[in-house]
Amino acid sequence: MDIKEYNSKNMGKQVLVLKEKDIKDLMHFSTIAKNESIKGLIASGKYAGFTDTYRLAVVKDSNEELQGADTKIYSVSVLEELKKAKSMAVLKDGKLAIQVDDDVTEYDPIPDAKVPDIKLFINNYEYESYSSGKVVEKITDDIVWKMLKVVDSSDIKRYFCFEEGKLIVEAYPNGNSVLLLDVLELDNKKAKLKTTLNFKYMDLWLKYVKDEKFDIALAKNNRNACQFRKDNLFYIVMPVALRD
């Protein structure tokens, strides 16, 4: 349907709206939507995004006048349309509307699907300390970072150490040596946490933010998730377990 005709027929029916930039930002994390257990795009409250139970990437709708969506999930097939989308909206009846060029197509949510209420992970999760951070120059091109990213996390003990205004990766390839790698510069020198995060998950985030500043919320301990945020995009990552 043509965008002008569509808007005239659906005025006041939208409960969540994302613009082109927010959709593009979210699609950087679209691989999360293709996991075996929770496939697709989730809408919940003011948020839309993806989760695979180990991590969550969502964009917040900044239109304060909109009430937010009921928790729904849409087929993973909509991702191909979102790659080209100028905007998307969730309507009061639960339908997802995606605008590509000047045309709008509607998609029904997956019926009777078990869907995690992603807004609760954003609104109800508690953190210990906060900081802004910036990536050390070209860290994702560093040969040590690349090596740690491809090696099985159970084969090498490695920790993400937030301390004294830095994030340093501490890795133990064998019992006699340690690798130290500066990853982030932090504004809050009192922020402190030693945890284990998945390198591939963190690499995805670092390639998204590039050299721009972003916000960090650190977990209370190494068993809880950390949150990374830039503008309307939230990325929550659970720690991984290391083999003794």
Task: Label each residue range with its predicted role.
Residues 1-244:
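DNA polymerase processivity clamps
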